[in-house]
Amino acid sequence: VWVSGELSSFKEGEDFYWFGTNTATRDRNFVIYSYPYTAYDTFTKEYFTHKRDSVMRVNIPGAREGMYMETDTLMTKVKGLNVQGQYALEARGLWRVKADMMGGPFVSHARVDTVNNRVVVAEVFVYSPDTRKRDLIRQMEASLYTLRLPGEKATQANDSIK
């Protein structure tokens, strides 16, 4: 996967990686995490948001106890799409921090790593109060399409991105 060099902060958790700019404005973030693939219902909105919320609660806590990132389920849409010739669930919506006034847009791609029988989720989200976020999230979203799972070949265009 290609991640912008501007994302200079890094955190590692259990089956979880976060890269971000860690700034108060125009904050851009990329996360990738995985969990066992057990059934097709993994690709429903309900399962996806439940799993996303549990992973983010552990790995992206708020400033105080009881604060954590969660999905605004009313403002989140999911759909299937084809990425690298394989099915992917795309989730596009809003996140917020429980018990705080933070939030913003996110885009996630969930795919099955058939070699390791795991669901791999790559996600981008931004926090940029009082500014338009469309261009920020679109720039970040492009990195989701550069993810190559085990057994997938990189395309020519992406071979030059290192």
Question: Where on the chain are the PLM-derived regions?
Answer:
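Glycine-rich, often proline-containing surface loops adjacent to acidic residues and nearby aromatics
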Residues: 28-30, 87-90, 117-124
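Signature of long, low-cysteine stretches enriched in small and polar/charged residues
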Residues: 60-116, 131, 145
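Coil residues (strongly favoring Ser/Thr
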Residues: 42, 54, 72-73, 114, ...
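Secretory pathway targeting signatures of secreted, lumenal, and periplasmic proteins
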Residues: 6-61
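Short, flexible beta-strand-to-coil junctions
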Residues: 23-24, 35-39, 95-97, 124-130
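A short, polar/proline- and glycine-enriched secondary-structure boundary/capping micro-motif
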Residues: 28-31, 42, 101-102, 132-136
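Surface-exposed amphipathic alpha-helical segments
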Residues: 7, 119-162
